Amino acid sequence: MENRITWQVTKGCERLSGGCDSCPSYLHSVKTGDDYSVQLCPEQLALPTMDNTPKIFAVAFGSDLFHESVPLDYIKKVFAVMNDTPQHTYELATKRIERASVLAERFEWTNNIHMGVTVESGEYDWRIKFLQSMPSAVKFISAAPML
């Protein structure tokens, strides 16, 4: 198993801003005609529990765990796995930081959970204020794609 792994607990997304037009996952779906609607992938939940060697998991990259159609109970299951596997580091990035900040108090934020926000242009720098309020020990900003 590699040291850095994409953990696809959800797949698909929905266009939210101009930055989405450059998303590799979205572009792949356009090219192939694949369904890009948000889908839960519960069969992936146990993946981090299968290896005790420390890994870095990119959580739902190319998707968004905090998309409005992802149920709270499902997000809680994802957090339970992250909390129960402290040997791993988890990187969550979202454009839907408002929802993440509203739900944040419902989760346990162990130190291995890093929260990030995508800010693809100055038009979306307001997302940073929401990120600052998040209870994660490590926060990051993604500027991809930078428009």
For the regions a protein language model found, what residue spans apply to each?
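Histidine/lysine/aspartate-rich catalytic loop segments that bind and position anionic ligands
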Residues: 117-147
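Conserved Radical SAM active-site core
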Residues: 1-113, 122-124
